[in-house]
């Protein structure tokens, strides 16, 4: 009988997922992969299985990955110092060589290999391939003690100007799963290091994706009592930022999700990547495992 109960439980999970599979079949979703999910073997495996399953049941997943800790590790081994300003890496030419080597090389190919080992057909890209990510230099704005805005030069740190969607559509219309390293190139051929959340958001916007999923090391967006907010409208997010409930390091991540939704992505999800199979749970279950952000005023029912 215990085995029968397990079978019934699995059947219930599948029947709960079915309406979501039908609803999202043929839709594109962009998943930002980073944090603990990239360093824990069990989480790595569950992430790869999630991506392969999404492709198998008819969705078009696109992966954008980070890799800051891996960059830090190689810089340390090489004896190079990399400064940060408000969490942004100051990237000179020597640092950029390491960033490109790690993100476009070892990290990208290890994710491709991971997905392929679990039955997928992943293909690795950087923003330089086919001019996929067109970029320009990012000038960071900060207020000085007098309240005046000053621009800070972060070196070869960029922002996204445009996405060549035809490069990605070539793969999503086939069996391939694109895996993108967040490197961009400008009109002069200069390479830029770009925040992976921002790249994922801009890719999702450009493709008119159904969903943007940001895997993080936290449970999602929390209220003033540190309780998880499972669903938010864009108006509610604006209010929570204005009142200081969303603050610090969460502002850029939530801002990226907010911009994507305002730019045409149907919904954005800030998801706890420490939970095995977090991506599947967020998409294919009634409650999800993170915070959903959508233009609709009643977001909680939209998982």
UniProtKB/Swiss-Prot annotation:
GO molecular function: acetylglutamate kinase activity; ATP binding
GO cellular component: cytoplasm
Positions annotated to bind substrate: 67-68, 89, 193
Pathway field: Amino-acid biosynthesis; L-arginine biosynthesis; N(2)-acetyl-L-ornithine from L-glutamate: step 2/4
Subcellular localization: Cytoplasm
Matches recorded under Pfam families: AA_kinase
Swiss-Prot/TrEMBL keywords: Amino-acid biosynthesis, Arginine biosynthesis, ATP-binding, Cytoplasm, Kinase, Nucleotide-binding, Transferase
Reaction(s) the record says it catalyses: N-acetyl-L-glutamate + ATP = N-acetyl-L-glutamyl 5-phosphate + ADP
Enzyme Commission number, as recorded: 2.7.2.8
GO biological process, one term: arginine biosynthetic process via ornithine
Transition state stabilizer (site feature) positions: 32, 253
Family: Belongs to the acetylglutamate kinase family. ArgB subfamily.
Record function comment: Catalyzes the ATP-dependent phosphorylation of N-acetyl-L-glutamate.
Protein's recorded name: Acetylglutamate kinase
Organism: Acinetobacter baylyi (strain ATCC 33305 / BD413 / ADP1)
């Amino acid at each position: 009988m215990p085995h029968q109960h397990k079978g019934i439980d699995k059947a219930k999970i599948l029947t709960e997922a079915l309406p979501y599979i039908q609803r999202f079949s043929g839709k594109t979703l962009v998943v930002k992969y980073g944090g603990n999910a990239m360093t824990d073997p069990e989480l790595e495996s569950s992430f790869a299985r999630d991506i392969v399953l999404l492709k198998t049941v008819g969705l078009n997943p696109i992966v954008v990955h980070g890799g800051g800790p891996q960059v830090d590790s190689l810089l340390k081994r090489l004896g190079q110092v990399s400064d940060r300003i408000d969490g942004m890496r100051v990237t000179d030419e020597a640092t950029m060589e390491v960033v490109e080597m790690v993100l476009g090389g070892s990290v990208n190919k290890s994710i491709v290999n991971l997905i392929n080992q679990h039955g997928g057909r992943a293909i690795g890209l950087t923003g330089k391939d086919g001019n996929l990510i067109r970029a320009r230099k990012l000038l960071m704005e900060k207020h000085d003690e007098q309240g005046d805005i000053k621009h800070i030069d972060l070196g070869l740190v960029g922002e996204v100007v445009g996405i060549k969607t035809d490069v990605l559509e070539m793969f999503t219309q086939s069996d391939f799963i694109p895996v993108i390293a967040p490197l961009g190139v400008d009109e002069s051929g200069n390479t830029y290091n770009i925040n992976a959340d921002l790249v994922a958001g801009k890719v999702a916007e450009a493709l008119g994706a159904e969903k943007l999923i940001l895997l993080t090391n936290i449970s999602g967006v929390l209220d003033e009592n540190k309780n998880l907010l499972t669903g938010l409208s864009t108006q509610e997010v604006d209010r929570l930022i204005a009142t200081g409930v969303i603050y610090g390091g969460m502002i850029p991540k939530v801002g990226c999700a907010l911009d994507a939704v305002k730019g045409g992505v149907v919904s954005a999800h800030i998801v706890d990547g420490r939970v095995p199979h977090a991506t599947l749970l967020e998409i294919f279950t009634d409650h999800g495992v993170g915070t959903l952000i959508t233009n609709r005023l009643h977001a909680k029912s939209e998982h």
